[in-house]
A protein has these predicted regions:
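Short S/T/G/P-rich N-terminal loop/turn motif that feeds into the first structured element of a domain
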Residues: 2-74, 84-90, 103-177
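Metal-dependent nucleotidyltransferase catalytic core
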Residues: 92-98
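Conserved RNP beta-strands of RNA recognition motif
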Residues: 77-79
């Protein structure tokens, strides 16, 4: 299991690696089908975005977000950049992000930096960490590859985990249907 702790950086400057998560909400059936298709079709375009390092395309879950039932209206793009200026410029000017914005009824990008990172993602260590011990909002990205023999055990625990997340007063953002 990999866990990555990221700090929200509303005004980050300098040459620190920046991590962005861009969320897109799609309203019509047509735009939702477009977004789903882009999970496969955007790969070639993402690798050509100027300045992008590691990147991943995400779907989202429904209700408390941690369920096997997908939320077909919200998708996200996680990416690393060498600095904030490159991230902002590429997010604004690249054709693929412009297409996502054109299709979406709502979009939001969070700029962050990695505080800690443990494990690999697709065989890579995607985040350069710069521990700052900052007080403020944190984003935690947890991902895992599940072995088939562990699936039943994993999904049995999901309802309790979802309930804990949903009732935690410290959770300031979650994707709703």
């Amino acid at each position: 299991m990999c866990q990555h702790i990221l700090t929200h950086l509303p005004g980050a400057q300098g040459m620190t690696q920046i991590v962005t998560i861009s969320f897109f909400r799609f309203g019509s059936v047509r735009s939702r089908l477009w977004a789903f298709a882009m999970m496969g079709l955007a790969r070639g375009q993402m690798s050509r975005v100027p300045g992008v390092g590691f990147w991943k395309l995400f779907g989202s879950g429904s209700n408390e977000g941690f369920t096997p039932k997908p939320n077909v209206s919200v998708y996200a793009v996680l990416a690393t950049w060498p600095d904030r200026q490159t991230a902002a410029r590429s997010l604004q000017q690249s054709a693929i992000f412009a297409r996502y914005r054109q299709q979406a009824i709502e979009n939001w990008t969070v700029f962050m930096k990695a505080e800690t990172a443990r494990g690999k993602w697709s065989g890579q260590t995607p985040f350069s960490t710069t521990p700052q011990n900052q007080n403020g909002p944190l984003a935690v990205i947890t991902r895992a590859t599940l072995r088939p023999r562990k699936l039943a055990q994993f999904w049995r625990r999901v309802p309790n985990i979802s309930q804990v997340i949903g009732q935690d007063p410290n959770v300031v953002f979650k994707i709703e249907n």
